[in-house]
């Protein structure tokens, strides 16, 4: 690994990389979710006091890599996160690219059902092939129905306005 790992600058030999990876061999989805929920239970009360809206970004890619589990890949994962710490400050970065890589994710449905805690939007289009590989695509040419997603997000914003919520803005980046 020439360029290092996230959060590190040093490179690794394959042997060193495998040794580091082995330290995570006993961490499965259940343990990783428990760790995430423990973190959120500590940080969300502080976020509430500070008026900060936390928003977790979905896994990218939304499937295990190198044997490491992923726990923010589906609507059920987001529901689990919301239920673990029930606070409007415990929210989601809605990334159409990360969620859109999985054909079983209903992006418009996720907005309709869980949109009240979307605090940031990351509009990306991805294109899947028959083997499950994917690549970035032009916004209107990928597998994401960008029109339907944007319509659902605008309807969510209108709901927020109608009930007098202060957080009507959902910042986004393309």
Give the role of each language-model region.
Residues 1-37:
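Active-site-proximal, glycine-rich beta->alpha crossover segments in alpha/beta enzymes
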Residues 14-24, 37-49, 53, 63-174:
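Histidine-acidic metal/acid-base catalytic patches
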Residues 60:
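Residue-level "edge-of-site" marker
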């Amino acid at each position: 690994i020439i360029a290092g790992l996230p959060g590190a600058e040093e490179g690794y030999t394959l042997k060193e990389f495998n040794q580091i990876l082995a330290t995570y061999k006993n961490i499965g989805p259940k343990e990783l979710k428990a760790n995430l929920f423990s973190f959120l239970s500590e940080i969300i009360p502080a976020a509430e006091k500070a008026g900060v809206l936390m928003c977790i970004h979905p896994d990218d890619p939304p499937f295990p890599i190198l044997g490491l589990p992923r726990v923010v890949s589906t609507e059920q994962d987001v529901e689990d996160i919301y239920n673990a710490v029930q606070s409007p400050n415990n929210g989601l970065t809605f990334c159409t690219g990360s969620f859109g890589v999985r054909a079983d994710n209903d992006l418009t449905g996720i907005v309709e059902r869980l949109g009240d805690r979307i605090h940031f939007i990351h509009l990306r289009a991805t294109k899947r092939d028959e083997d499950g590989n994917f690549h970035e695509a032009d916004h209107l040419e990928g597998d994401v129905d960008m029109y339907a997603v944007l319509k659902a997000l605008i309807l969510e914003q209108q709901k927020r306005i109608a009930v007098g919520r202060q957080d009507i803005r959902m910042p986004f980046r393309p």
